[in-house]
């Protein structure tokens, strides 16, 4: 089944809900980049969060970038997500794997904090109208959910809960997705309702298991986690949206990027290497540019003064 996003409200319109399934997206990213289990999960969580953030943008061409800049062994992580349901991303050390951590109950989990280290989450929102909006917050845990919730609270002044999760088995990614819960201004004026919503969010346990159990039926997931808050998908065409991994890179874009190198560098590549090879960071597609194509680029540049 295709990955999808569902927009909904609950508590009589007092809270905004966005649920997403990203299993296929994460599987494709894992295959494209040769990701380990740890980096598959970290990039998957970031792509999930990026899609949930982009879902609130007013224009369909709007995009959200999430960048994790830290001193941890993952080095860096970058995600580009669109309001149109597309997403792409990469990590600095795709093969990174760390020993899992074990809690008092004997359960194992990924060591996100060690992988991320200390650093910042940088968020950029671009609606294509003037300068993009940029914001930076300190990393809370490196597990993405708490980090994005911190961004929403401190940069957008929107009380939010962000749940991201996955189930991993020996074959790879069994399930991946997330849930965004935001208290709307209407509910923020009612302390009792705010307290109830916060309590319900604290009571959400085993999110990854519940996500996997719901499969692609995200409406069932909403009913499962908020049974007494009457979650309802929006009553319009925006209620459900298909999601996919997509990168707009191309052979022509690769050649356009080479123009930035200038005449001397292009000439050197033509003469010494007989062409050029470019690899897209976001999707790992490779593009080969021949010596003849390099010559065409050189011929199109303004003559040297």
Swiss-Prot record:
Which GO terms label this protein's molecular function in UniProt?
A: protein folding chaperone; unfolded protein binding
Enumerate the InterPro entries for this protein: Heat_shock_Hsp33 (IPR000397), Heat_shock_Hsp33_C (IPR016154), Heat_shock_Hsp33_N (IPR016153)
CDD domains with a match to the protein in the record = Hsp33
Which cellular component, as a GO term, is one annotated location? cytoplasm
GO BP field: protein refolding
Reported function: Redox regulated molecular chaperone. Protects both thermally unfolding and oxidatively damaged proteins from irreversible aggregation. Plays an important role in the bacterial defense system toward oxidative stress.
Q: Mind telling me which NCBIfam families this protein's record contains? A: PRK00114.1
Family per record: Belongs to the HSP33 family.
Q: What is this protein called?
A: 33 kDa chaperonin
Organism equals Synechococcus sp. (strain CC9605)
Identify the gene encoding this protein. hslO
């Amino acid at each position: 089944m295709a990955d999808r996003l569902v927009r909904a409200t609950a508590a009589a319109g007092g809270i905004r809900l966005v649920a997403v399934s990203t299993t296929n997206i994460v599987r494709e990213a894992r295959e494209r980049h040769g990701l380990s289990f740890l980096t598959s999960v970290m990039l998957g969580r970031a792509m999930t969060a990026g899609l949930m953030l982009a879902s609130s943008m007013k224009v369909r061409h709007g995009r959200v970038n999430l960048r994790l800049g830290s001193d941890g062994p993952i080095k860096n992580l970058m995600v580009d997500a669109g309001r149109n349901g597309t997403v792409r991303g990469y990590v600095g050390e795709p093969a990174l794997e760390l020993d899992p951590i074990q809690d008092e109950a004997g359960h194992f989990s990924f060591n996100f904090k060690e992988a991320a280290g200390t650093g910042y989450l940088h968020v950029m929102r671009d609606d294509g109208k003037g300068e993009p909006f940029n914001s930076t917050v300190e990393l809370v845990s490196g597990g993405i959910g708490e980090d994005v919730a911190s961004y929403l609270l401190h940069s957008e002044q929107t009380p939010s809960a962000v749940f991201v999760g996955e189930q991993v088995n020996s074959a790879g990614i069994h399930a991946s997705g997330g849930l965004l819960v935001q208290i709307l201004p209407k509910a923020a004026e009612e302390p009792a309702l705010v307290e109830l919503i916060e309590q319900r969010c604290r009571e959400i346990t085993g999110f990854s298991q519940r996500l996997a159990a719901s499969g692609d039926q995200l409406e069932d997931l909403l009913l499962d986690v908020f049974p007494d808050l009457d979650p309802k998908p929006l009553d319009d065409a925006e209620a459900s949206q298909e999601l996919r991994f997509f990168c707009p890179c191309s052979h022509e874009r690769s050649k356009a990027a080479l123009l930035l190198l200038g005449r001397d560098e292009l000439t050197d590549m033509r003469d010494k290497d007989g062409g050029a090879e470019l690899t897209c960071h976001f999707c790992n597609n490779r593009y080969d540019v021949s010596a003849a194509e390099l010559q065409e680029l050189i011929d199109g540049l303004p003559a040297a003064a």
